[in-house]
Swiss-Prot record:
The modification Cysteine methyl ester is found at C173. Optimum pH is 7.5-8. This is Protein tyrosine phosphatase PRL-1. PROSITE patterns: TYR_PHOSPHATASE_2, TYR_PHOSPHATASE_DUAL. It comes from Trypanosoma cruzi (strain CL Brener).
Length: 176
């Protein structure tokens, strides 16, 4: 059984320096874990964020040196405050890595919970307006992010403002 995902690279401003890579994918099943381990290895993934209930054992990924973070929240809903805090803490930890490691994010179908976390990262660290971030993600993952999640992101107040010391620009984002 094959595995695939959508890789989103975020570059710092006008430069070619990649700040974050996100690999959005659907949840592995017990029979497809091996294919997903290979996919994660291909993109040098070290962190996997599981934004849904557990559908597979993390052991195969952990044996390859990957950390699986279980940060589940309700299907179709925006992330909880705990998930937001955990996600942003992970991004803070990874933002200055050179070269940046890919952060993989999945939910059941890779269309709701995982994409909204990536859109949140684009708003927080890329300084992208929420609609632009959602449009950017939807342009790469058809059907991603529902109206409830979009409305939440539109009301979200970023912790990192563009122009602040910790702010990054994703104006040069590219999908590979």
């Amino acid at each position: 059984m094959g595995a695939n995902g959508t890789l989103v690279e975020c570059k710092r401003g006008e430069s070619d320096a990649v700040v974050f890579r996100f690999l959005i994918f659907d949840a592995p099943s017990p029979s497809s874990v091996t294919a997903y381990v290979k996919l994660m290895q291909k993109y040098n993934v070290r962190h996997i964020v599981r934004a849904c209930g557990q559908t597979y054992s993390a052991e195969a990924f952990e044996k390859q040196g990957m950390v699986v973070h279980g940060w589940s929240f309700d299907d179709g809903a925006p992330p909880t405050q705990t998930v937001i805090d955990n996600w942003l803490n992970l991004l803070e930890q990874e933002k200055n890595k050179s070269p940046p490691e890919t952060i993989a994010v999945h939910c059941v179908a890779g269309l709701g919970r995982a994409p909204i976390l990536v859109a949140l990262a684009l708003v927080e660290y890329g300084g992208m307006p929420p609609l632009d971030a959602v449009g950017y993600v939807r342009g790469r993952r058809k059907g991603a992010i529902n109206q409830v999640q979009l409305n939440w992101l539109m009301r979200y107040k970023p912790r990192h403002q563009e122009g602040n010391e910790g702010s990054l620009s994703c104006a040069g984002c590219a999908v590979m």
